[in-house]
Swiss-Prot record:
Lineage: Bacteria, Pseudomonadati, Pseudomonadota, Betaproteobacteria, Burkholderiales
GO molecular function, one term: membrane insertase activity
Family membership: Belongs to the OXA1/ALB3/YidC family. Type 1 subfamily.
Bilayer topology annotation: Multi-pass membrane protein
PANTHER family: CYTOCHROME C OXIDASE ASSEMBLY PROTEIN COX18, MITOCHONDRIAL, OXA1
Chief subcellular location: membrane
Assembly: Interacts with the Sec translocase complex via SecD. Specifically interacts with transmembrane segments of nascent integral membrane proteins during membrane integration.
Protein name stated in the entry: Membrane protein insertase YidC
Cellular component terms (Gene Ontology): plasma membrane
Keyword Cell inner membrane part of the UniProt annotation: yes
One Pfam family of this chain: YidC_periplas
UniProt-listed InterPro entries: Membr_insert_YidC, Membr_insert_YidC_N, YidC/ALB3/OXA1/COX18, YidC/Oxa/ALB_C, YidC_ALB_C, YidC_periplasmic_sf
Cellular compartments annotated: Cell inner membrane
Family matches, as CDD domains: 5TM_YidC_Alb3, EcYidC-like_peri
Organism listed in the record: Burkholderia cenocepacia (strain ATCC BAA-245 / DSM 16553 / LMG 16656 / NCTC 13227 / J2315 / CF5610) (Burkholderia cepacia (strain J2315))
Length: 552
């Protein structure tokens, strides 16, 4: 009995430790077991910009087509502000770069009057989307564009779309007109690059589209760290995350060319992604370009353009929340930016079910409660088998203690006597372990569903819980969880081994302290799960006791 419970506690504890260590590494913090280099590299002498950790053979030398350096010459430029129903933003006329993007429907958890800013370019933070041409002395993101047809830059009540166009200076016989199309209610931005050959010779440019970001960590609740960094998706390799640390060490491994897929920057709850046209050949690159500054992008070749002719390259830019159903409708595999890790195969159906329940009850907190009840109901036969095994072990515990006392000076005889007792009573000391172990992947999957789902962000439950993605402000749920864990422990007999007895008392305290800083939605799940487990164990144990009291 005591051995089995110790094994279960060790499994639970190690699972929690591994999850936390995974958060540390995904969030750019050193592993508790395998420390790695930090993301921020020493500043280069003189502040020079370069390609840094470019993988050999990945991006050619600058003259042959690498995206330009981030260092821009001094020139007059301005910020063009715009507004839609979902965005407030700024386009920098230097390069026609999308330099700031605020999500108007995503409030700040700590300051309700503020909104989440995804793209930004300030002294302390850089995150932007930009494009340009390679293959010659053509317009790129360092050149100052001119806004065409300046007028209203806001999406008015009678408009469904807002178009903003910017024209480059002529360079290398080429002029570029870049048009952003914003659609009402959509987090997908159309980006059209029109290339006009105004020279006297054919040109064969390449369009690059990239996301540039520093490695500044996103502020999240304690113990809620998820992946931050570039990602690539192709039909051949599917979803590939790229750690900033791998770019630091020039060890990033990802698909380098395709005619499908997308590239993205991923963070907790939000993402951005360049989505070129399906079937268009493109090269994919990801690299470090400055101390603590990285980029991921695609380079799409354009067929030769004769003098006086033009070519259009169309792409889409997603920038918004990681809402799973919305992402599924935008591009194949884009929903994978909502990263469940190795439990995706279980987590996705769980989120589908959670979403269906929410559709009926209209409250994510109650949806979590009902989903937990459903999961416990599904696993009731396994739980019953576990509790029955525990009850049988509890019955023979006095005899086990007597054997231990009798043979305490001879461990070999004691083990033989215990095995004989198990055989005689037809009891498996580990009989209650397997049913619990089988359920662990499901519980971990639900944990990641609640952690990764932006739908929980800002979602209230009842009374004092106004945001399920933030910790309980009054620590009521963590206290309830601590109480429930102590009740669960008290339902089982105290192990005869003093060390194991201390461990059984320490574990609830350790987990309770850790859960004080978990998002309220996660703690709610564990509280409900514990309460249901206590009820199940009480019911099954009482039922077994009633059966044994009946006359033969």
């Amino acid at each position: 009995m005591d051995i089995k419970r110790t094994v279960l506690w060790v499994i639970f504890f190690m699972s929690a430790v591994m999850l936390y260590d995974n958060w540390q590494r995904d969030h750019g913090r050193p592993s508790m077991f395998f420390p790695s280099a930090t993301h921020t590299a020493p500043a280069a002498a003189g502040g020079a910009s370069g390609t840094g950790a470019t993988t050999a053979g990945d991006v050619p030398a600058a003259a042959a087509g690498a995206a330009p350096s981030t260092t821009a010459p001094a020139a007059q430029a301005q910020l063009v502000k715009f507004s839609t129903d979902v965005y407030d933003g700024e386009i920098d006329t230097r390069g026609g770069t999308l330099a700031k993007l605020t999500l108007k429907k995503q409030g700040d958890g700590k300051q309700p009057d503020l909104y989440i800013t995804l793209f930004d370019h300030t002294a302390g933070h850089t995150y932007l989307a930009r494009t340009g041409l390679l293959g010659g002395d053509f317009p790129n993101h360092n050149d100052v564009y001119t806004q065409l047809n300046p007028g209203s830059t806001s999406l008015t009540g009678d408009q469904n779309t807002l178009k903003l166009s910017f024209e480059s200076p002529v360079k290398g016989g080429v002029k570029v007109v870049k048009t952003y199309t914003f659609t009402r209610g959509s987090y997908v931005i159309g980006v059209d690059t029109k290339i006009d050959n105004v020279g006297t010779a054919p040109v064969t440019p390449t369009v690059y589209m990239e996301l540039v970001r520093d490695n500044t960590a996103v502020e999240t609740p304690m113990f809620s760290h998820t992946f931050l960094g570039p990602a690539v998706y192709t039909d051949a390799k599917h979803f590939q995350k790229i750690d900033f640390s791998d770019l630091d060490k020039n060890k990033a491994n990802f698909e380098k060319s395709a005619d499908n897929g997308w590239v993205a920057m991923v963070q907790h709850y939000f993402a951005s992604a360049w989505i070129p046209q399906q079937g268009a050949k493109r090269d994919i690159y990801a690299e470090k370009i400055d101390p603590a500054l990285y980029r991921v992008g695609v380079k799409q070749p354009v067929a030769a353009i004769a003098p006086g002719q033009s070519a259009d390259v169309q792409a889409r830019l997603f920038a918004g929340p990681e809402e799973e159903r919305m992402l599924e409708g935008i591009a194949p595999g884009l929903e994978l930016v909502k990263d469940y890790g190795w439990v995706t195969i279980i987590a996705k159906p769980l989120f589908w079910l959670l979403e269906k329940i929410h559709g009926y009850v209209g409250n994510w907190g109650w949806a979590i409660v009902l989903l937990t009840v459903l999961i416990k109901a599904v696993f009731f036969p396994l739980s019953a088998a576990s509790y029955k095994s525990m009850a049988r072990m509890k019955e023979i515990t006095p005899r086990m203690q007597a054997l231990r006392e009798r043979f305490k000076s001879d461990p070999q005889k004691m083990n033989a006597a215990l095995m004989e007792l198990y055989k005689t009573e037809k009891v498996n000391p580990f009989g209650g372990c397997l049913p619990v172990v089988i359920q662990i992947p499901v519980f971990i999957s639900l944990y990641w569903v609640l952690l990764a789902s932006v739908e929980m962000r800002g979602a209230p439950w009842i009374l004092w819980i106004h945001d399920l993605s933030q910790r309980d402000p009054f620590f009521i749920l963590p206290v309830l969880m601590a109480v429930s864990m102590f009740v669960q422990t008290s339902l089982n007999p105290t192990p005869p081994d003093p060390v194991q007895a201390k461990m059984m008392k320490f574990m609830p305290i350790a987990f309770s302290v850790m859960f004080f800083f978990f998002p309220a939605g996660l703690v709610l799940y564990y509280v409900v799960n514990n309460v249901l487990s206590i009820a199940q164990q009480y019911y099954i144990t009482r039922k077994l006791g009633g059966v044994k009291k009946k006359p033969a």
